[in-house]
């Protein structure tokens, strides 16, 4: 006999009345593939139906007062133990579904954290509902201007991968960054001894990183004096230095403590406080838990001085509504080399997301539009004159 599917319930509320309206909001990340990131659906709640998304706004048509549910989870398409829906509506009954765990994730010896659910109330209009949501989001992480505000230059943008980054290159780039008013200079993949699969100079891997205990130390051939000259010159110019980092992915981030110690050591030796976290794949609840442990350990040991730029461009990651307590979101890779950078595309994504995600939580790229103009020849509108 076929067993009946059981809906995993995060939260639910049952209100009186027949005139409930709702809006579900679904998000897409994996922005290397997706360029439409926000999907709204307006409904009149009737008989029991399911909807996808991280947000559900519901309001009573008789008095226009409402509630919202925020599901603190990755985007719907990459959630763990996903049952195809995030919300159920049934007249005045609203249910948040999907715990992000299965029975195999629950053991008697420890607490297993599910996805989160936030309930908020709001008044009579659109502004009220968005203000209620934003009021909560602003309190997830204490905002500090000296830590959280930045205009960042990243070395990956010149498209040479890791083939150019070295002490001389970085010192020259710092001078140019200062002229542009850059506040943070981030050295991407290539500063470290270990080689990633994206290396242009050697065949590398993200697996078994800790087979090389020096993987996350500055490459002595590129940086013979370590990162000290870079950090020193940055301070003189008023520019903070950041680094790229890829946690060791195998076995559900089982080496999270080693990763945490590597980050803490970089903070203590060089004062590095900004790390771009790349290459994540979260295949299980254990992996998600270990990532929380990694981030929490680093913040604890650095008195919350560190901020993580969490890459949302690929794979199964945290999306826009999970891990928000740790920093900001690196939204997308767009390159003139690939003819996929148009300013209005980028600004459109920022505009649509900013309705539901604080804009200051999003890192948005702006490129040198005078590079590769030949690739845009023949388009109906001149690339260099495109506007949002």
Where are these regions (language model features)?
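Conserved small/polar residues in nucleotide/adenosyl-binding loops
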Residues: 384-388
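Aromatic- and carboxylate-enriched substrate-binding clefts and catalytic-loop regions
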Residues: 186-375, 380
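Short, solvent-exposed loop/edge-beta patches enriched in aromatic
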Residues: 3, 178-182, 237
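Conserved, mostly hydrophobic/aromatic
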Residues: 109, 153, 234
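An acidic-aromatic substrate-binding cleft motif
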Residues: 132-176, 180, 184, 188, ...
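Short conserved micro-motifs at the rims of enzyme active sites and ligand-binding pockets
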Residues: 81, 125-126, 163-165, 320-321
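N-terminal accessory beta-strand-rich subdomains and adjacent acidic, glycine-rich linkers
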Residues: 1-133
């Amino acid at each position: 006999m076929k067993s009946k599917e059981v809906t995993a319930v995060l939260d639910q509320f049952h209100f009186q009345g027949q005139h409930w309206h709702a809006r579900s909001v679904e998000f897409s990340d994996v922005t290397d593939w997706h360029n439409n990131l926000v999907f709204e659906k307006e409904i009149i709640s009737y008989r029991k139906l399911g909807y996808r998304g991280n947000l559900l706004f519901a309001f009573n048509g008789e008095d226009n007062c409402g509630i919202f549910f925020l599901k603190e989870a990755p985007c719907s398409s990459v959630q763990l133990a996903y049952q195809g829906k995030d919300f159920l509506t049934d007249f005045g009954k609203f249910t948040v579904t999907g715990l992000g765990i299965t029975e195999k994730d629950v053991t008697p010896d420890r607490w297993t954290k599910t996805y989160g659910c936030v309930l908020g109330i709001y008044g009579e209009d659109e502004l009220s509902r968005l203000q209620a949501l934003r009021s909560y989001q602003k309190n997830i992480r204490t905002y500090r201007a000296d830590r959280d505000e930045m205009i960042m230059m990243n070395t990956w943008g010149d498209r040479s991968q890791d083939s150019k980054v070295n002490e001389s290159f970085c010192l020259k780039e710092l001078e140019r960054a200062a002229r542009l008013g850059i506040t943070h200079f981030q050295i991407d993949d290539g500063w470290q001894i270990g080689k990633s699969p994206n290396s242009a100079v050697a065949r590398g891997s993200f697996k078994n990183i800790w087979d090389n205990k020096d993987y996350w130390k500055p490459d002595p051939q590129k940086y013979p004096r370590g990162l000290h000259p870079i950090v020193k010159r940055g301070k003189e110019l008023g520019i903070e230095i950041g680094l790229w980092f890829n946690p060791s992915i195998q076995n559900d981030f089982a080496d999270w403590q080693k990763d945490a110690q590597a980050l803490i050591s970089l903070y203590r030796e060089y004062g590095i406080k900004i790390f771009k976290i790349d290459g994540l794949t979260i295949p299980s609840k254990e992996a998600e838990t270990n990532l929380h442990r990694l981030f929490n350990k680093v913040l604890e040991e650095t008195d919350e001085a560190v901020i993580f730029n969490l890459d949302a461009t690929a794979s199964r990651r945290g999306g826009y509504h999970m891990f928000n307590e740790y920093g900001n979101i690196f939204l997308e890779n767009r390159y003139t080399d690939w003819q996929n950078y148009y300013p209005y595309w980028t600004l459109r994504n920022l505009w649509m997301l900013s309705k539901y995600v604080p804009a200051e939580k999003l890192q948005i790229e702006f490129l040198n539009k005078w590079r590769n103009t030949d690739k845009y020849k023949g388009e109906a509108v001149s690339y260099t004159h495109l506007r949002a």
